């Protein structure tokens, strides 16, 4: 039986992602954390590690 991967398994801390939707479309971010529903991402300019952006994982694409 295959286990469902959790959000933190699919997007580990440090994962580079590109925003696919929203006003930040095509911007690059680093995943800083995740919970059951959202990724928390930072770019070091507007969104820092201490104040990350909350992002729907359906609107994020893995880069590496």
Question: PLM features: residue spans?
Answer:
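Ferredoxin-like alpha/beta domains used as RNA- or RNAP-binding modules
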Residues: 1-13, 20-21, 30-64
């Amino acid at each position: 039986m295959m286990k469902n991967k959790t959000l933190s398994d699919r997007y580990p801390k440090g994962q580079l992602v590109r925003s696919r939707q929203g006003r930040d479309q095509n911007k690059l971010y680093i995943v800083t954390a995740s919970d059951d529903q959202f990724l928390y991402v930072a770019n070091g300019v507007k969104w820092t590690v201490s104040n990350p952006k909350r992002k729907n994982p359906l609107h994020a694409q893995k880069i590496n």
